[in-house]
Design a protein with these regions (language model features):
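Conserved structural motif at the start of ABC-family nucleotide-binding domains
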Residues: 5, 20-22
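Conserved hydrophobic segment flanking the Walker A/P-loop of ABC-type ATPase nucleotide-binding domains
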Residues: 26-29, 74
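The feature captures the beta-strand-to-loop junction immediately N-terminal to the Walker
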Residues: 36-38
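Walker A/P-loop
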Residues: 44
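Helix-to-loop junction immediately C-terminal to a conserved catalytic motif
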Residues: 50-52
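ABC ATPase NBD Q-loop/coupling interface
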Residues: 61-78, 131, 173
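Conserved "ABC signature" C-loop
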Residues: 86-129
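ABC-family ATPase nucleotide-binding domain "signature/switch" substructure
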Residues: 96, 129-211
């Protein structure tokens, strides 16, 4: 696990128009960063830029990983992405969680319990086969499956894009208590939140300051 990633001079664009300019993000292991701002301001595009290195949606001028300059192509593998539009595969629940990697069953069960997925595991089992469109599961269940997959990926940094969009308030709070109190490193786009929730993050980036 890397200790620190600094991204400086981040610009985000859409259809040739700059949305955000000159953002700096310092990501330190174990820290939690919230990203706020109005709808359509470029928050999700910012996340996509980090995982894709797509020059058509923006650029990052300077990238420093553990004190050494690196290229954008060197950092995409550091991130695991979980969004408000979860993607599932036409395969077993186990494969959707692990993507075929060798992960101990207890580790998978522990993450499922932390993310309120243990009820699905008890009811359907890990051999339950999902359809590609998620038929038979709620939006909240699909979102939690994708989030669990991201956590189990063991990627150093999670990118969380409005993961609570389809969660009820109790599940949302349970999951966030787990995330806030974990040793996970993540950047999270938050839209509907209480002001007091911000104290659970080590840094808050309001993209309105960079538009």
């Amino acid at each position: 696990m890397h200790d620190e990633l600094s991204l400086d001079g981040i610009s985000v664009s859409r259809n040739g128009r700059n949305l955000l300019e000159n953002i700096r993000i310092d990501i330190i292991r174990g820290k939690k960063i919230a990203v706020t701002g109005p709808s359509g301001s470029g928050k999700s595009t910012l996340m996509k830029l980090l995982v894709s290195d797509d020059e058509s949606i923006g650029r990052i001028d300077n990238i420093i990983l553990d004190g050494k300059p690196v290229d954008a192509t060197d950092i995409s593998s550091l991130f695991a992405y979980s969004s408000q539009y979860p993607v599932v595969l036409a395969d077993t629940l186990w494969f959707n969680l692990t993507l075929g990697r060798k992960i101990g069953k207890q580790r998978v069960m522990d993450v499922c319990k932390s993310l309120d997925l243990d009820d699905i595991v008890r009811e359907k089992g890990f051999d339950y086969v999902l359809s590609a469109d998620g038929t038979g599961l709620s939006g909240g269940q699909l979102a939690r499956i994708e989030l669990a997959r991201a956590v189990l990926s063991e990627r150093p940094i999670l990118l969380l894009d409005e993961i609570n969009a389809s969660l009820d308030s109790r599940t949302d709070m349970d999951i966030h208590h787990y995330l806030w109190n974990s040793n996970l490193t993540f950047i999270e786009i938050i839209h509907h939140y209480k002001k007091e929730d911000l104290k659970n993050y080590d840094a808050v980036i309001d993209v309105s300051d960079y538009s």
